[in-house]
Amino acid sequence: QNETNKKCQGGSCASVCRRVIGVAAGKCINGRCVCYP
């Protein structure tokens, strides 16, 4: 998993994860986007 410092408030992390790891897979944990390659 790849934890980012991008805050997420009930929104999707897909766009963030697509930028970070190239795959729109992730979820919001403790207010941060965590991406799963």
Curated annotation (Swiss-Prot):
GO MF annotations in UniProt: ion channel inhibitor activity; potassium channel regulator activity; toxin activity
Residues of the site described as Basic residue of the functional dyad: 27
Name of the protein in question: Potassium channel toxin alpha-KTx 15.1
Compartment annotation: Secreted
Site (Hot spot basic residue in hERG blocking currents): 6, 18-19
Modified residues (Pyrrolidone carboxylic acid): 1
SUPFAM superfamilies (alphabetical): Scorpion toxin-like
Disulfide bonds: 8-28, 13-33, 17-35
Species per Swiss-Prot/TrEMBL record: Androctonus australis
Domains as described in the record: Has the structural arrangement of an alpha-helix connected to a beta-sheet by disulfide bonds (CSalpha/beta).
InterPro entries: Scorpion_toxin-like_sf, Scorpion_toxinS_K_inh
GO cellular component: extracellular region
Key words of the record: Disulfide bond, Ion channel impairing toxin, Neurotoxin, Potassium channel impairing toxin, Pyrrolidone carboxylic acid, Secreted, Toxin, Voltage-gated potassium channel impairing toxin
Endpoints of the signal sequence: none
Tissue occurrence: Expressed by the venom gland.
Function in brief: Blocker of voltage-gated potassium channels (600 nM of the toxin induces a block of 25% of hERG currents). May also inhibit Kv4/KCND when coexpressed with DPP6 or DPP10. In adult rat brain, it blocks the transient potassium channels in cerebellum granular cells. Blocks potassium channels by a simple 'plugging mechanism', in which a single toxin molecule finds a specific receptor site in the external vestibule of the potassium channel and thereby occludes the outer entry to the potassium conducting pore.
Pfam families for the chain: Toxin_2
Site (Aromatic residue of the functional dyad): 36
Family that this chain belongs to: Belongs to the short scorpion toxin superfamily. Potassium channel inhibitor family. Alpha-KTx 15 subfamily.
